[in-house]
């Protein structure tokens, strides 16, 4: 039988690094109760994104934390707030944007750690729960509002700004 596709190379995934003990905080949270059946959780990391200097940024959903790992592998807690950040991306102008399940579309001042709401609702309607985002080459921002939707409830949305 003809197969036009080449054999896929299997690559063994290995941990890049682990969260330092000083940032681990195993306890129940209002995020973990519905999403992890009430289990204690140390962290739930999402939204990896590199800035222009090569630092790796990501979010910790249950604790509302934004972290940066420097090019030297040093962890830094940039900010912590009362939200559930899920996705993080950098615009080509250097600004950081966050999709937050509870708070909507946010911006982050990477120097001060200040969080600002860009869009908390749309068309006078609350979001279901923002999840992730992507910047197109022309600068348009696409973001998903999925909440707890899925096959049984296919009402999630994609927005463009």
Model-derived features: where do they sit?
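Sequence-structural signature of mature extracellular/luminal beta-sheet repeat domains
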Residues: 1-161
């Amino acid at each position: 039988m003809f197969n036009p596709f080449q054999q896929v190379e299997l690559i063994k995934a290995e941990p890049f690094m682990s969260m330092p003990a000083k940032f681990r905080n195993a306890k129940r949270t209002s995020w973990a109760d519905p999403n992890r059946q009430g289990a204690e959780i140390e962290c739930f990391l999402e939204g990896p994104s590199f800035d222009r200097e090569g630092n790796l940024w990501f979010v910790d959903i249950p604790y509302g934390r934004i972290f940066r790992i420097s090019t030297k592998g040093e962890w830094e807690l940039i900010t912590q707030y009362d939200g559930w950040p899920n996705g993080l991306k950098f615009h080509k102008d250097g600004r950081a944007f966050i999709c937050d399940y509870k708070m909507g579309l946010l911006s982050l001042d990477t120097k001060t750690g200040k969080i600002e709401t860009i869009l908390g609702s749309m068309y006078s309607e609350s979001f279901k729960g923002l999840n992730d985002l992507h910047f197109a080459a022309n600068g348009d921002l696409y973001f998903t509002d999925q909440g707890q939707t899925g096959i049984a409830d296919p009402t999630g949305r994609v927005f463009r700004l």
